[in-house]
């Protein structure tokens, strides 16, 4: 039985947004060690190399939970590890972050290209735009966006752009289909970055995976952290006793 739950953060915002969720998961799952794993330095590394690096860094047979880009990396790592992964949970994480001809329920290419260009020209302005999008759909978006911006950790522009390129590159459709362990994928109903319309297509990738709507915004794991912690705990406890 796994003794660890690892949380992977999203692009640009660092580990702080996951801290409250981690504390609540600690309380809900006292039998597990909950740790937040910062994303690795993505500069100059392929997606395959990053997955291999995370495989070396993280405990074997742990539960993996990731937010947005962290969820995409967790999904790829779960498929890489297979039976050496206890289970997978993602929040606001699309199999393809950027739309493709065969995956339209994602961010349009033109929108992503314009955002990447903004970050290349003025990273601070790009982060401000990003936190506004993360907060869109929340009951109180302005305080939430200020909270996110205050602790954002995008690194330098080279690192930030490399992270965006990774978001555009990753395609986890095959990973979701191939991973045989427990999977819970949660999409926010009014997410401005990962459209909830992806839900039905995600369900078609793996009939054994659980794909649900949870929360309202891309940053819903902050404002609804207690409910999310309980949903995750219920899923893990069922998986451990299956």
Language model: regions and residue ranges:
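Gly/Ala-rich beta-loop-alpha elbow adjacent to hydrolase catalytic centers
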Residues: 66-70, 74
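Conserved HGGG/HGGXW glycine-rich cap/lid loop of the alpha/beta-hydrolase fold
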Residues: 1-47
